[in-house]
Amino acid sequence: MPKRNDIKTILVIGSGPIIIGQAAEFDYAGTQACLALKEEGYRVILVNSNPATIMTDKEIADKVYIEPLTHDFIARIIRKEQPDALLPTLGGQTGLNMAIQLHESGVLQDNNVQLLGTELTSIQQAEDREMFRTLMNDLNVPVPESDIVNTVEQAFKFKEQVGYPLIVRPAFTMGGTGGGICHNDEELHEIVSNGLHYSPATQCLLEKSIAGFKEIEYEVMRDKNDNAIVVCNMENIDPVGIHTGDSIVVAPSQTLSDVEYQMLRDVSLKVIRALGIEGGCNVQLALDPHSFDYYIIEVNPRVSRSSALASKATGYPIAKLAAKIAVGLTLDEMLNPITGTSYAAFEPTLDYVISKIPRFPFDKFEKGERELGTQMKATGEVMAIGRTYEESLLKAIRSLEYGVHHLGLPNGESFDLDYIKERISHQDDERLFFIGEAIRRGTTLEEIHNMTQIDYFFLHKFQNIIDIEHQLKEHQGDLEYLKYAKDYGFSDKTIAHRFNMTEEEVYQLRMENDIKPVYKMVDTCAAEFESSTPYYYGTYETENESIVTDKEKILVLGSGPIRIGQGVEFDYATVHAVWAIQKAGYEAIIVNNNPETVSTDFSISDKLYFEPLTEEDVMNIINLEKPKGVVVQFGGQTAINLADKLAKHGVKILGTSLENLNRAEDRKEFEALLRKINVPQPQGKTATSPEEALANAAEIGYPVVVRPSYVLGGRAMEIVDNDKELENYMTQAVKASPEHPVLVDRYLTGKEIEVDAICDGETVIIPGIMEHIERAGVHSGDSIAVYPPQTLTEDELATLEDYTIKLAKGINIIGLINIQFVIAHDGVYVLEVNPRSSRTVPFLSKITDIPMAQLAMRAIIGEKLTDMGYQEGVQPYAEGVFVKAPVFSFNKLKNVDITLGPEMKSTGEVMGKDTTLEKALFKGLTGSGVEVKDHGTVLMTVSDKDKEEVVKLAQRLNEVGYKILATSGTANKLAEYDIPAEVVGKIGGENDLLTRIQNGDVQIVINTMTKGKEVERDGFQIRRTTVENGIPCLTSLDTANALTNVIESMTFTMRQM
């Protein structure tokens, strides 16, 4: 069937900012889909609010709108552009929910817009828990005993019938938002009321828990002629009860008999046929390990996290083909892009094993609740490919960058066995490592199975890994055992530990005896057809399939899994760098391990190595490919941290040299440089012990900022006000030592400014200067950034330009540099310098049309910026005002304090652009999920040091008609200035403020930190209550001020004569 030619223009909705449950996989899917539709000759219009994506580049669609993903804004775009059709299944849950709202409000009908791909009725049938259950009953497909509730009372009625444990699943949400497992009345009350709040339909499904069953997923495709195939089936190692996004997953499934595999395959295809899915779809099933009983858990009628994983696991481009199916093409008429000879209707076959392990943010949020359940908590994931299950698992573990390299924790031997078993019996993110530790201590597999319900097949594999460890210990230095361990994925580091050697010695031993990996191709067909995809994984076998060309090559290191502080922005820069390398005539090679991203799409680079980003794994590739050099400045801290390790092996680091990278990172050298070029920084000292830190602080004067050297995303950074807090920090937060000193700096309050620049060694160009709304002290990734600066004087701008040029040339940057300044009352100071690509590169590139990562890469290859037509200094400003607003995922993370500070907490970002600052801020805030209302009630409770400042704010909010609630201290202050405020009680008292928040009486909360134990706990409870109830809580008065400006611009002020 040929494609449809009754439609010309297609609107694609992206998935918005990265949050837990909706990460980079949608950038990958959206990019693929837009390109696929353009390839078929359609005009594509894209709307997405996330500037950090490849998808929002002008090359990807014919028209790109970076606007908030809300009904009103998308409706405006539809009215303006008049598209013929809308493709909603590539924007995650956000895209689906938007399509449903636009249909229900009549916008699609009024503008004659058709929905492409899966019919709306099918989407609703899959997403609405009631309709789905009815359909399954008609098909005779078993679903767990369940009930739909719209109130907490109904939930308790159902509990009377089936008892605990119960699983709560809110309708029309993703990543299990608001859901959970309940074991008692208290949990049932809390989780159901939460779930009803987060569900757009105020509807929850309660089901009898089948925790302990095997969780199996099928990724399926269907077209309009009813051709349907299974692209990939996957098995969760963790049984049902842990969200699939938080589970360790293996593909293909390992423990199903052929009968079970075919039974579940038939059910999956039966269900998508009954739903009438056109495109990709993910089916989750639960299988009883002791019988052929199964249940269907849920169906996602769209491209998902699992489909990105399935695409990378098989090489079969699901999103690309789903987009083509949506415009009428069928599976039996589209060629599989990997083989180029077989059709897309052939099911892929794997001759390898892949493991996916989620990446959690608990290294950032040590107090966060680690226990895993049906609500997702991981920010990203890694994938690894091997020829044995053990190999793929161990490669995935060392891709995580937790400092773990193996099946066990770095300090594993220090725990006693009872503690280890206690940790295994709870499902949390470290359980896998504790299982390894328990097996090492001789705990039986039966005991572990009883605690975890993990299949014996996997437990035997873990046992095998531990057995090999013991054999290595008994045969130190034995080459046979070295080879054997390599077959099962052991790293040199682990072998070195057991051999009692250094990692370097094991590496040399391998080189001398020619024990090196070969690289196998991922070809979708287990080598059945000829294939020429440049997509490889390493393994210790005999035949190497990666043919080395004689072209000059440049190797680019990717940024690994998405985590807080290192998001999709670095993948964006990686992809642009690759494009620049190819344009310059070199062969571009990528090494990365994140299955969600555009950079690991095999069609982007000349060669893709899907491997861990460790010294050993990267060196193996370099030894084979012998590139001209390696580029480290686009892969975040992951890549920068590998620079000196690779250089020791004689590898050429392209761009800013290793010694210059160190000059920017090493405190002493950096201070010397600043003195030489005459750029001031806040007074600071280094401390290697708590005593030294106290002496430093006494000299500098409080408040001081303390942090370890060499970190990204402000890990373990704090602002402290006195000796007691400093002592606390030095003893609990960090282990200071001569190798790892702690930096103690004077804390300057003032405007924070961020600048990105590109330098080729002679010329420095500055695409833009951004001003932060929050004053210094809030991490730059969590601040609202504004371009162009709104409140700086000509002198300040000139000084910033001058200092940036001096710094770039002084460090001798080749490529990108990111600098943060603070403007205090007595001038401009430099806060920090990052000699690499930064979080703001995509944002600035989009605004200014200066392809920063590409220019930086061209400079690294040796081209000159002046030859490209750029002049030194700040580039001409783009028209309009642009803001970058942070987006947080606190509703998924319990026990995490949402107060903004020097440690980064946001998972993503949105952009707002318009003609005035207020309009741009309105879009930025709306896009980030803060609903801006022109009237309502604000609750103020601020620390003593902020009481003066809050008066002005209260006055303005009062004038635009906001009602003010305040705690007694704040209310008394307001009364002095005749500002009316209703006094609310402290926690636990009469008219308690938490109850007011829970009852929905409050639209905005303004709360600033007070230090001191009891008060801190109160503040923490207030802030968490706002999160659980979905109310914006501003912990910085600067953000509150900006919000007030926006409210004033939307409304009229009422003042008496």
Curated annotation (Swiss-Prot):
- Residues reported in the UniProt entry to bind Mg(2+) 4: E832, N834
Functional pathway: Amino-acid biosynthesis; L-arginine biosynthesis; carbamoyl phosphate from bicarbonate: step 1/1; Pyrimidine metabolism; UMP biosynthesis via de novo pathway; (S)-dihydroorotate from bicarbonate: step 1/3
State the EC number(s): 6.3.4.16, 6.3.5.5
Region Oligomerization domain: what ranges?
402-546
The GO molecular function terms of this record are: ATP binding; carbamoyl-phosphate synthase (ammonia) activity; carbamoyl-phosphate synthase (glutamine-hydrolyzing) activity; metal ion binding
Q: Which residues bind Mg(2+) 2?
A: E298, N300
The lineage's top-level taxon is Bacteria
Q: What is this protein called?
A: Carbamoyl phosphate synthase large chain
